[in-house]
Design a protein with these regions (language model features):
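Short, hydrophobic/amphipathic alpha-helical packing segments
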Residues: 31-35, 169-172
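Predominantly the structural core of cysteine protease catalytic domains
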Residues: 60-233
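Intrinsically disordered, low-complexity terminal tails
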Residues: 1, 235-236
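Active-site-adjacent structural segments surrounding the nucleophilic cysteine of cysteine proteases
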Residues: 1-27, 32, 38-60, 79-109
Length: 236
């Protein structure tokens, strides 16, 4: 995506806090939004994966988790469709949300089936000590939407979200576009899902992703296989 703008491929809005329940599952929501956007852009497939499954697989509990742990859980346990393990209106207790724990054999099998079809990789783009974060992020946006850690949320008089240099982060979401020298565009999973951040926003951590569909190789019969099959047929 040479212009770094993934806005046409963003998934449907899903909130991490519903039914009066805060899930603390922002690392799963932010990561899956990036994955769903990337798959839609590369393969034209609209997916909606279960953040509950990913949170359980990653061992997420209040007050949250590391995006790196979440990504490694995806590489180990895969993903499943939201409809298989949804965040329904009946779930209003944290122990209900993060259940079943451990995951059932059926859910694990569904996740492993996804791994048979997709190759998922991830890598850090920005650390707190990274120099020229703006260049690193704008370059990385050519290849995927970016999972970013942020300090949620403080607005200035222009309606842009700000963060002082060195402030700690407490949230994780999706960076999907930028205006050079002006603002960063964020897709969030709280109210006001589309946010603009000041250009010199001091992101703490940022991670890019890669998705590749695994081609199923079907071995073609050799000449000798065909010959054996031919004689087998005529000898019947």
């Amino acid at each position: 995506q040479q212009d770094g703008n993934w806005s046409l491929y963003l998934p449907d809005i899903e909130y991490q806090s519903r039914n009066g329940l805060e899930t603390y599952n922002c690392t799963a929501f932010g990561t899956l939004n990036c994955i769903e956007t990337l798959i839609r852009r590369k393969y034209g497939v609209i997916e909606n994966f279960s953040e509950r499954f990913t949170g359980i697989a990653a061992g997420t509990r209040p007050p949250g988790n590391s995006p790196h742990v979440v990504c490694d859980a995806i590489r180990d346990k895969g993903l499943i469709d939201e409809r298989v393990l949804p965040f329904g209106s009946d779930i209003d207790i944290i122990d209900e949300y993060y259940s079943p724990y451990p995951l059932t054999a059926e859910l694990l099998y569904a996740g492993k089936s996804w791994l048979d079809k997709w190759e998922f990789t991830h890598e850090w783009v920005v650390y707190p000590s990274t120099k020229n974060k703006q260049k690193e992020l704008s370059d990385a946006l050519r290849y995927s939407p970016i999972g970013v850690s942020v300090m949620a949320w403080r607005q200035n008089n222009d309606g842009l979200y700000t963060k002082e240099k060195g402030e700690g982060d407490n949230h994780y979401c999706t960076l999907y576009n930028y205006e050079q020298g002006e603002a960063w565009h964020i897709f969030d999973h709280y109210d006001n899902t589309n946010k603009k951040l000041i250009w010199n926003y001091d992101f703490g951590y940022a991670k890019r992703f890669s998705m590749k569909k695994i081609e199923v190789c079907i071995n073609k019969p050799t000449f000798f296989d065909s010959l054996k099959n031919y004689f087998r047929e005529i000898m019947k």
